[in-house]
Amino acid sequence: MNSEWSLDILYKGFDDPKFSEDLTSFEKKAKELDELSKTLSHENEKKDLLQIVKVLEEFELLEKHLSCFGSLSQSTNTANAKAAAAIDKVATIASTASKAMAVFSRYIADMKDLNSYLDCPELCEYKYFLNDIHESGKYLLSEDVEEALAKMNISAGSAWEKQQSLLTSSLEVEYDGKKLPLASVRNLAYDVDKEVRKAAYEAELKSYAPIADAVSFSLNNIKLQVITEAKMRGYTSPMDMTLHQSHVSQKTLDALLSAMQKYLPVFHKYLKRKAEMLGYENGLPWYELFAPIGKSATTSFTPETTKEYLVNHFRPFSDDLADMMEEAFDNNWIDFYPHKGKVGGAFCCNMPFVKQSRVLTNFDGGLGDVVTLAHELGHAYHGLNIESHRPLNWEYSMPVAETASTFNENIIMNAVIDETEDKEVKLGLIENQLQDLCQIICD
């Protein structure tokens, strides 16, 4: 089992002839979209709609192949110049199709009898997708403005995002006489030694000083772009735009936030009690948020034992899920360990066009890392279930995306707690759950 993922199923590298061929095909497909956008007529709506869907599917497949390879390559090495160049090239080509995309969206939004075309086999699976475009027409800008926004994003919000990622992923932290990646130092927040937790926290904060202004500048400009675009499109706020794009109503969000606010006093009580158990009288220091309580589970996991643990616990629930987990470990879907230049945190990238996913994590061998992998493999399972969908139906909103992953977390944590007989270890496990919930609700 390799500790690094393989991207060979996409391309062998940026010098792979197939990468160049697909890049050329992608550019041609963008031009084809532009040409198609100039031939539309409401006298031939069904015929036009069929052609739009066909070309968009082909465009989507090429873009996914190319962009996934670029972004995944860069996520494990943010200094990879070839990856950065490829990402910019793909984004630039995609932006040339933005005007055509706006024309298609406006054309669909103006259709009077859209649903009458959606019974045919080629379009029936896209009923939701096409109706969503139809209903979102009021937020469209002119074709020229849509094109300008897409092109400017490459050197605006997208560029600021890349800068923030590069600065934090390449940051080295001076700790205990050594230089460590930021992700490794942040993992020390879970150490059993209070002095280690405090020293790591202070070292982390100190390391931010040289990049603090640049990161703040990046984040502020990302948000400014969102605020500006939301206003231009006619949304009442960035939140209104996000809710619309996520297919969540304000009423639903208000209900969720209301429930969270109702239970905040319970979390405050938990944090005060944790502070007392750790010997603090005036509340819990920030660097102690992840301090272990009770007895830590002594098991230290490797990728091999993590695979066995997850597969054994998910097999009784779902053979499909367990089989997919085995494939992920055996076929190099996962990039495990932190190192300089690798982005922090964890994520899953679905690649339904090759019937696989890729998972990045900063594995340190603790139970929390096992839970993180269960979470990310939940996203991969979601990817497994969209493989049979047509390309334009592969996208889904965040509320949907987090369903399988959060479910997986609960499955694994509940199983671990039930299997533990030592009360102090059980306390530690329950506290781990409370930590996670506290981050979601309070942070």
Segments predicted by a language model, with ranges:
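A well-structured
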Residues: 1-295, 307
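Active-site-adjacent bridging/hinge elements
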Residues: 235-236, 240, 283-285, 347-356, ...
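Conserved helix-loop functional segments at active or binding sites
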Residues: 312, 316-323, 349, 379-390, ...
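Post-HEXXH active-site segment of zinc metalloproteases
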Residues: 371-372, 383-407
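Active-site recognition of the HExxH zinc-binding catalytic motif
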Residues: 234, 364-383, 405
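Short pre-active-site segment immediately N-terminal to the catalytic Zn-binding motif
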Residues: 298-303, 354-374
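Catalytic zinc-binding patch centered on the HExxH motif and its immediate surroundings
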Residues: 299-301, 334-356
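Long, amphipathic alpha-helical stalk/connector segments used for oligomerization, subunit docking
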Residues: 414-443
